[in-house]
Amino acid sequence: MKRQFEIVSAYSPQGDQPVAIEKLVEGINSGKKKQVLLGATGTGKTFTISNVIKEVQKPTLVMAHNKTLAGQLYSELKDFFPNNAVEYFVSYYDYYQPEAYVPQTDTFIEKDAQINDEIDKLRHSATSALFERDDVIIVASVSCIYGLGSPEEYRELVVSLRVGMEKDRNQLLRELVDVQYGRNDIDFKRGTFRVRGDVVEIFPASLDEHCIRIEFFGDEIDRIREVNALTGEVLAERDHVAIFPASHFVTREEKMKVAIENIEKELEERLKELNDNGKLLEAQRIEQRTRYDLEMMREMGFCSGIENYSRHLTLRPAGATPYTLLDYFPEDFLIVMDESHVSVPQVRAMYNGDQARKQVLVDHGFRLPSALDNRPLTFDEFEEKTNQVIYVSATPGPYELEQSPEVIEQIIRPTGLLDPPIDIRPIEGQIDDLLGEIQDRIAKNERVLITTLTKKMSEDLTDYLKDVGIKVNYLHSEVKTLERIEIIRDLRLGKFDVLVGINLLREGLDIPEVSLVAILDADKEGFLRSERSLIQTIGRAARNENGRVIMYADRITRSMGIAIEETQRRRSIQEAYNEEYGITPKTIQKGVRDVIRATTAAEEPETYEATPAKKMTKKEREKTIAKMEAEMKEAAKALDFERAAELRDLLLELKAEG
């Protein structure tokens, strides 16, 4: 359906936004493949990108480097485009422990996953929207380059129903089962259907409250209605409805037969290879596991871990590029890579990490070699599948700059705020000097961020400041999400005035009350003192009209020189603009929100075993379970499979005793 993108906003582009929009649109219309938008912190990059989408009218994929950032972008874009399809596509695992084998201890860890039903619904909503309309924006995490089923199969297996169409009721039921819908007359939920005489109700995989009621008269569809699944209230009459498959890995029966033959062939070859090499245990293992999966596929049409056979199911040759979300888009689409200095390296790294784990499973007989083809795209494959890309970052990386030497800049903030001035002061006597600066800020009811290089220095500095009566807190890597949000909130509310940390570049640290950022050991070259990190850190003081940065250093390194020069260049552009238009910089006014939803902090393992489960109260048990689940997710994320499996077993015991 041809619908136009339209922005709903009380604001119009300001500052250098109109020029950036014009240049980006011009580049896209003239066929430029890659462009870079260098947008300083707080300049309204999302609003600029929204205007570009509105002007070029192309389906757009916005990629972010984590779920938190993707969630923020999704909310913002949904506000700008309330009448268009803004969709969300991230990994649907709340907790995902991939199957893994640890040869040293002969430990096989089964895949264990907890799927978030809401996110699964949003993923189906995203893919079906791409086949139903043109005005689609999908906000995705980098996991969108992971393998997905074939878009051709997904499109061809759509069950299309129209009023007046001749169709036998039982034929419709068979078609629904073929696209992985289950009949359930009692527990009616997403991905199921129920039958009452001549009425069939279908709960599409992409909806969460509405279902479709099909009323038959003989062998003809008499009426199609959209109904509230809970109350039965009729919401709308429909002439036509398209029911998309309930799984992205759907395969027609004839293809499934060919796939099963090919899997059997591969199994025979692999068994011969393993037996010839004297790997009898591995041969027995792979035969047992694969034959069980094949039996399930013959009987049920699917099996647990069916994605590992995706190469056979889509009849692709070995080593072929897998299908991903990118294949569901039409040919002429736009990709926006947000925070590209992080997301581009992330796309590069995905493939190698995945292959390393799967290779161990293949070598030890847990998976057939074809499982290696259920994988994310390599960087070159990703490049081939992209049409036109806009890289967005305050500090674009070397790859983006090499791809698009002409950078489009967005330096001016709608609030008139300037990049902060930078002082360089000697390391000797830095703490006493810093103490004086902190006291000045406290007197004005402003806040201070201090970044150090080591955990020890952070702890020592925090202790020292506490001893001299400063209200201070320390943000380190062990602080989990929920605590972190609370710490930032308390800093904004003035429960303490100074926040010390090592890496202050993570999201959520744009705090308008902060007027001083102090960088200790600024002259020690390295990851957190590279020019990009320094520019991003300096940006933390750009939300306050009195913002200032102090670098404590005995020499000016190359990175410091570049960061200082770039900040001064941006500041002079901003000052000239403010002078020309008579703008007075004003600190951003941003309400302090309560913590809405996040993960509880997880404690060290020994604290779990300190209180025997039998002696715990119900509340204590629930609290411990929540903490352990959080740590289990963290362990799986950090690829610490043994720890995750150990926690999973502890959890099962706890739940059983509850």
UniProtKB/Swiss-Prot annotation:
<dbReference type="InterPro" id="IPR001943">
    <property type="entry name" value="UVR_dom"/>
</dbReference>
<keyword id="KW-0742">SOS response</keyword>
<dbReference type="InterPro" id="IPR004807">
    <property type="entry name" value="UvrB"/>
</dbReference>
<dbReference type="Pfam" id="PF04851">
    <property type="entry name" value="ResIII"/>
</dbReference>
<feature type="short sequence motif" description="Beta-hairpin">
    <location>
        <begin position="92"/>
        <end position="115"/>
    </location>
</feature>
<dbReference type="GO" id="GO:0003677">
    <property type="term" value="F:DNA binding"/>
</dbReference>
<dbReference type="Pfam" id="PF12344">
    <property type="entry name" value="UvrB"/>
</dbReference>
<protein>
    <recommendedName>
        <fullName>UvrABC system protein B</fullName>
    </recommendedName>
</protein>
<dbReference type="Pfam" id="PF00271">
    <property type="entry name" value="Helicase_C"/>
</dbReference>
<dbReference type="InterPro" id="IPR024759">
    <property type="entry name" value="UvrB_YAD/RRR_dom"/>
</dbReference>
<keyword id="KW-0547">Nucleotide-binding</keyword>
<dbReference type="InterPro" id="IPR006935">
    <property type="entry name" value="Helicase/UvrB_N"/>
</dbReference>
<dbReference type="InterPro" id="IPR041471">
    <property type="entry name" value="UvrB_inter"/>
</dbReference>
<keyword id="KW-0234">DNA repair</keyword>
<dbReference type="GO" id="GO:0009380">
    <property type="term" value="C:excinuclease repair complex"/>
</dbReference>
<dbReference type="Pfam" id="PF02151">
    <property type="entry name" value="UVR"/>
</dbReference>
<keyword id="KW-0963">Cytoplasm</keyword>
<dbReference type="Pfam" id="PF17757">
    <property type="entry name" value="UvrB_inter"/>
</dbReference>
<feature type="domain" description="Helicase ATP-binding">
    <location>
        <begin position="26"/>
        <end position="413"/>
    </location>
</feature>
<keyword id="KW-0067">ATP-binding</keyword>
<feature type="domain" description="UVR">
    <location>
        <begin position="622"/>
        <end position="657"/>
    </location>
</feature>
<dbReference type="InterPro" id="IPR036876">
    <property type="entry name" value="UVR_dom_sf"/>
</dbReference>
<keyword id="KW-0267">Excision nuclease</keyword>
<dbReference type="GO" id="GO:0006289">
    <property type="term" value="P:nucleotide-excision repair"/>
</dbReference>
<dbReference type="InterPro" id="IPR027417">
    <property type="entry name" value="P-loop_NTPase"/>
</dbReference>
<dbReference type="InterPro" id="IPR014001">
    <property type="entry name" value="Helicase_ATP-bd"/>
</dbReference>
<comment type="similarity">
    <text>Belongs to the UvrB family.</text>
</comment>
<dbReference type="GO" id="GO:0009432">
    <property type="term" value="P:SOS response"/>
</dbReference>
<keyword id="KW-0228">DNA excision</keyword>
<comment type="subunit">
    <text>Forms a heterotetramer with UvrA during the search for lesions. Interacts with UvrC in an incision complex.</text>
</comment>
<feature type="domain" description="Helicase C-terminal">
    <location>
        <begin position="430"/>
        <end position="596"/>
    </location>
</feature>
<feature type="binding site">
    <location>
        <begin position="39"/>
        <end position="46"/>
    </location>
    <ligand>
        <name>ATP</name>
    </ligand>
</feature>
<dbReference type="GO" id="GO:0005524">
    <property type="term" value="F:ATP binding"/>
</dbReference>
<dbReference type="GO" id="GO:0005737">
    <property type="term" value="C:cytoplasm"/>
</dbReference>
<dbReference type="GO" id="GO:0009381">
    <property type="term" value="F:excinuclease ABC activity"/>
</dbReference>
<dbReference type="InterPro" id="IPR001650">
    <property type="entry name" value="Helicase_C-like"/>
</dbReference>
<dbReference type="GO" id="GO:0016887">
    <property type="term" value="F:ATP hydrolysis activity"/>
</dbReference>
<keyword id="KW-0227">DNA damage</keyword>
<comment type="function">
    <text>The UvrABC repair system catalyzes the recognition and processing of DNA lesions. A damage recognition complex composed of 2 UvrA and 2 UvrB subunits scans DNA for abnormalities. Upon binding of the UvrA(2)B(2) complex to a putative damaged site, the DNA wraps around one UvrB monomer. DNA wrap is dependent on ATP binding by UvrB and probably causes local melting of the DNA helix, facilitating insertion of UvrB beta-hairpin between the DNA strands. Then UvrB probes one DNA strand for the presence of a lesion.</text>
</comment>
